[in-house]
């Protein structure tokens, strides 16, 4: 066979390869996407409000002057993940919340009950709905920390707002003592 035949075959294969690559933009899920509007988000962004990611539980009888030595347990809201379903003007949210507790200097026992909230807010900070949940965290004997993955399901009205305009926010429902404590003592 002559070299001319090989060159013709190579040119033909190269042309076919270019045709295949060019057609990728016409195959769904490959290549260039449609130039229409981007897909709507499936779920609002879920965030833990940093100032409310920590809480403290104090020994009974703690007076007006709260000190770190009075802390029985610290609560740490460490992670949140959400999946959603939209039905008209209603948002059904399935949440997994990772909540930990740590023994404080005044710890008694192994269990602590903490309260956290989940809310749906609009981009202008309007609260469209809020739900509170209680969770018990058990700390194993001789351990400093324990944690739970608390799964909850909530339904919020969206007030007709698009999902892209909404946020899911969460944090601990702070007691007046905890608010005062964190004003005076930074950190945990």
Where on the chain are the PLM-derived regions?
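C-terminal motif of bacterial Sec signal peptides marking the signal peptidase cleavage site
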Residues: 19-23
């Amino acid at each position: 066979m002559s070299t001319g035949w090989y060159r013709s075959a190579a040119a033909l294969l190269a042309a076919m390869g270019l045709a295949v690559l060019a057609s990728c933009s016409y195959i769904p899920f490959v290549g260039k996407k449609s130039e229409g509007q981007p897909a709507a988000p499936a779920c609002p962004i879920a965030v833990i409000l940093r100032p409310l990611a920590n809480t403290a539980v104090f020994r009974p009888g703690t007076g007006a002057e709260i000190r770190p030595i009075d802390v029985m347990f610290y609560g740490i809201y460490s992670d949140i993940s959400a999946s959603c379903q939209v039905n008209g003007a209603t948002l059904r949210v399935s949440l997994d919340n990772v909540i930990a507790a740590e023994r404080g200097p005044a710890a008694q026992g192994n269990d602590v009950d903490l309260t956290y909230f989940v809310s749906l807010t609009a981009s202008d900070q309007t609260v469209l709905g809020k739900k509170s949940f209680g969770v018990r965290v058990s700390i194993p004997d001789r351990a400093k920390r324990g944690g739970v993955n608390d799964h909850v399901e909530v339904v919020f009205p969206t007030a007709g707002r698009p999902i892209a305009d909404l946020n899911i926010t969460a944090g601990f429902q702070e007691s007046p003592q905890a608010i005062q404590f964190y004003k005076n003592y930074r950190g945990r």
